[in-house]
Amino acid sequence: MARRYWNIHLEEMMEAGIHFGHGTRKWNPRMAPYISAKHKGIHITNLTRTARFLSEACDLVFDAASRGKQFLIVGTKNKAADLVARAAIRARCHYVNQKWLGGMLTNWSTTETRLHKFRDLRTEQKGGRLDSLPKRDAAILKRQLSRLQTYLGGIKYMTRVPDIVIVVDQQEEYTALRECITLGIPTICLIDTNCDPDLADISIPANDDAIASIRLILNKLVFAICEGRSSYIRNP
């Protein structure tokens, strides 16, 4: 896999607060190689390492996108939800930004059944057929549709498990990460100083609580995916 230049600068990472970790009491000793200092009771992430692993992640997603692979972006906490949806839509990726339903990947047949139900209800609603039902029946189906839209709206076009999963918060999305490990799906994960860097295929040391930090990381990955997709379109 060829290495490319992704315009990753230490200055912009510092401005985004990527280097700010958690308090020194809330840390995972496995993160020691990725921490450069302590400052006012918090750990400071080594941004040189962040740049290196972010660049590797961009290389990976570019290569995968250039071969037509499918991506899933997962980030369900409030700070990340909107950023995840925007990034995924921009790069034509699937996403989960509300609750992760246990077994979403490992029990794919159940997820597929839910997706079929979701698509059928959307078709019926668009055709106006729900409004022709008795009020009680229509209300029940509309509630089902609303719930399915909330939890499955970001994966409504997904027809199989993804080829690569991008995880915004390791601890928040631990169940999703474990499902990927079980299925052998490659993962890219933002890891703060309280995380385990060994759980993902590519771990990017970064502040996973600051909106600016999450946005910058996602923007770099999305740009690489879009570039890869353009390459795939030009050279199918």
Swiss-Prot record:
It comes from the Eukaryota. GO terms for molecular function: structural constituent of ribosome. The keyword GTP-binding does not apply. Belongs to the universal ribosomal protein uS2 family. Pfam families: Ribosomal_S2 (PF00318). It comes from Citrus sinensis. The keyword Plastid applies. GO terms for cellular component: chloroplast; small ribosomal subunit. It is found in: Plastid, Chloroplast. The lineage of its organism: Eukaryota, Viridiplantae, Streptophyta, Embryophyta, Tracheophyta. PANTHER family: 30S RIBOSOMAL PROTEIN S2 PROKARYOTIC AND ORGANELLAR (PTHR12534), SMALL RIBOSOMAL SUBUNIT PROTEIN US2M (PTHR12534:SF0). Gene3D superfamilies: Glucose-6-phosphate isomerase like protein, domain 1 (3.40.50.10490), Helix hairpin bin (1.10.287.610). This is Small ribosomal subunit protein uS2c. Keywords: Chloroplast, Plastid, Ribonucleoprotein, Ribosomal protein.
